[in-house]
Structure formats: C-alpha cells, structure tokens
Amino acid sequence: MNFWDTEPAKPEFDYNVEKKKFIENMDYLSAMSVEEQTLYKKWQEWNSDLATSMKRKASLALHYDALWMPTDIYDKEQTIKEIENLDPYVEIVDDSKESTRWTEIRKLIHTMSFDANPGRNVKIYVKDRVSGKILGLVSLGSDVTSLGVRDTYIGWTQDNKYKDGRLNHTTIATTIVCTQPLGYNFLGGKLVACMATSPEVRKHWKEKYGQTLIAVGTTSLYGIHSQYNGIPHFKTLGESAGKVATKPDDSVYEVWHHWVKEHKAEEYARQTAEKEGVDGPATGVKQKIINMIFKEVGIKASHYQHGFKRGVYFAQMYDNGNEFLRNEITEDQLVMKDKFVDGDEYTMKWWKPKAINRYKKLHEEGRIKPESLFYIDIIGMSWEEAKEKYLNEVGR
C-alpha cells in the first residue's frame, strides 16, 4: 500500500451525491482565511476519529513533561542564565516506537497538521543535554522535484536531477518546529532551523542513504516573512510560483480517491508513477490525485487557493555545492562553508546572544508570552471552541 492510500470500507458510491459533497466541502474551506484553514485541519487531525483520540488522551498528555520550559519566565536573571546554559543537540529517531512518539509530539506542538511525506524520511529531536528536554522537532524528506526559485538558484537541469541523481543530495525540511514559549520569546524556531543542518544530520544522511547531503531546503506557509529570515544558514530565495492549494477533508477525498483509482486507472497510474533517478514515489502525488478529482467533478483548482505563496529557503552547505548539483564537479572537490564545518558551535554563538536580546526586549516592554502550545485539549472541542481558543495562536 502506498503512503497516500487508505483502506476504508467501500460504501455504495452515488456519483451526484458525492460530487455535491466534494464541492460543498471545497466551498466551505475556501471561505476560510489561511489561518482558519490551518487550524481547522489541526482540529480535524485530533477529532475526525474522536473515539480513538479520547482513548489515547491520557497517554498523549504525558508528552507535555518532555518539553523544555523556563523555570520562571518572568525572572529575568534566572531565565537568561538558563538560556546561556542550554546545550542543544540533535537526536535521530531510528526505531518505530520512538517514531510514533515523535509523530504524536509533532501533532501536539505544531499548528500545521502532519502528513507523512513520500520517499525518504528522517525524524529528529532537538534536545537540551543539560535537562534532557525537547526544544523542537525536525523532519527531512525527499526533495520536491520542481521548485522554481530553487531551481533557478542552483541552475540545474532535469538530467542533473534525475539521470545524474543530484536531487538525492538535497532534502526538504517538511517539519521545523520548536516548543513554546521557547519559540516566541527566545527565537526558538531559528535555533531548530539551524540544527537541521547539524553535522550529526549530515552524517546520518550519508550513512542511511549513501549520499552526501549538500543542502537543506524548506518553505514557509505565510510568504517570505517567517522565522527563517535573518538566519545565516539559510538563504531566502523568494516565493513559490503558485499559490497554496486548499486541500479537501480526508472524508471526501478518500471516497473520490478510490473512485478515480478504479475508474481512471490509466491516468491514475501515470500520475502516481515514480520518476527515474528519484528515490521514492512521486513527490506531490496527493495533489495530483486531487487535481484529477477536480477535473472529474468539474471545478478548477485555481478557484480554491488561498492568497499566500510559500517562502522558499535554502541552506547550501558548500561553497561550490551548486556546481556539484549541476554535475560540474565531483564529490571529492566539494568545499564546505566554514559555518557548517563549525556546526553546532557556530549555531550557538549566533543564536544565544540573539535569543537573550529578544527576551530582554520583550521583558522590558512587558510583552512576554509565557504560554506553552500543546493541543491536548483540542480533543473533544467543538470547532467553534477551537477557534475561540487557538485561532490567535496560528503562525505564532
């Protein structure tokens, strides 16, 4: 079974009824702001199978104690000392039980819903050695095959990506999230983003996949104004060419997914086929299936896009990394940038002063936000209750 497949029981399919349901769902979602859509998907993530979520709620709540928190965020002297003493490191997740725990924590601390990406997948904790607590999470996956501003920046060709296999030397960070209140008060998101380029990450990538990791890319949901701005590890490349598509609820998607798979088998096979030279299934395949459904029910994808383009960011770790990705030099000719040679030490020298200055400024201005962000109580909430409590937290 493929990652995008599901196995629900197959009810009787009424074409006109299901078409109406699908269009009504898309219209309902498109009437929301991007922030509201984001929260709605989060609410559904925990409430679409409420019985299961309720059974797991007590064990899920235990994850809260694993998260880093300042002892007393209003105690300026003590909090600054705690930041100075932080010793962040990356811990690679390498067994199924820990992978499940990582996913649960990811769903509890991040406003974006979680979808497992196709192909390669590396899940990472960013932890503090002193306390053992979690500072944030990272997931790295198979890079997207086409991304305009990135492709222009690198200057590579289709042959470079697939025939030469260079696309397997880059990755996209599908999750970069820090805990709160570390994020807002101490620029924790910037710290976790930097740690995605850690020497331990590069070492693991080489050991697991047999290829040198040249660069880490990522995107932001809300255009180019994001946590990635101003990080020396990442270059802001611009915005993605297209606006972000609104995705239907799983309940209506699954019904139509199985219908097109059965009744449009030839086109379905073509859309979901692997690309030669790329490790894993076609990236973006779920969106291709959604586009097939749009065509079938007679609606245009362009009518269901929100107003934000994605900001695109790229951590090129070698002075001549783009030349390697264009297949102009061999691996033994690569020259790593000094900041990535220095690794976590460089990151700490850059981040800690900025984190402390950010905290001091917020403290002086009375703008400290002490709240954590942990979505355990969204389980069992109505949609209206979830909006009232959490809508202002989206994008925090």
Role assignments for model-derived ranges:
Residues 5, 14, 27, 49, ...:
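Acidic-enriched, low-complexity/disordered segments with a strong bias for Aspartate over Glutamate
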Residues 2-50, 55, 263-396:
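Long, compositionally biased intrinsically disordered regions
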Residues 22, 64-71, 75-97, 140, ...:
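Generic preference for hydrophobic/aromatic residues in regular secondary structure cores
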Residues 1, 40-43, 65, 99, ...:
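Intrinsically disordered regions, especially transient/low-confidence alpha-helical propensity segments
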Residues 54-57, 62-64, 68-76, 173-175, ...:
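Long, compositionally biased intrinsically disordered regulatory segments in eukaryotic proteins
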Residues 6-24, 33, 95-99, 103-104, ...:
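Acyl-donor binding region in acyl/amide transferases
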Residues 28-131:
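Low-complexity, highly charged intrinsically disordered N-terminal segments
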